[in-house]
Curated annotation (Swiss-Prot):
This is Small ribosomal subunit protein uS9. It comes from Ictalurus punctatus. The gene is rps16. Keywords: Cytoplasm, Ribonucleoprotein, Ribosomal protein. One of its GO terms (molecular function) is RNA binding. Component of the small ribosomal subunit. Belongs to the universal ribosomal protein uS9 family.
Amino acid sequence: MPAKGPLQSVQVFGRKKTATAVAHCKRGNGLIKVNGRPLETIEPATLQYKLLEPVLLLGKERFAGVDIRVRVKGGGHVAQVYAIRQSISKALVAYYQKYVDEASKKEIKDILIQYDRTLLVADPRRCESKKFGGPGARARYQKSYR
């Protein structure tokens, strides 16, 4: 077996609420898989365009030289989709910064941020905790005077 050069790979994560997606990006031929399945098979089908946004924005040629494998867990369907798209975007930016050049990384970053900032920056909002005196965070139990 011939000796290969050092493996060019980066590992980044994307988060939304309690969903966490970890993306491994390495030199390859344009594969993007989520939990071992291609992007096109991810449910719900209505959110597939959200997953494909980074690819559609940047064009397939930028993804042609890399393979991205994503593991996602936690959260609901929508939160997982947002975590996946963020991890894919961050993985490509990190790969270009480390192994390609700074100019193309900046170009990719500018395109993504101009379209939607959450593609690269996590949404800090979290669920507010429940308090006593009511069924939820802000709602109070009904009060009766008679």
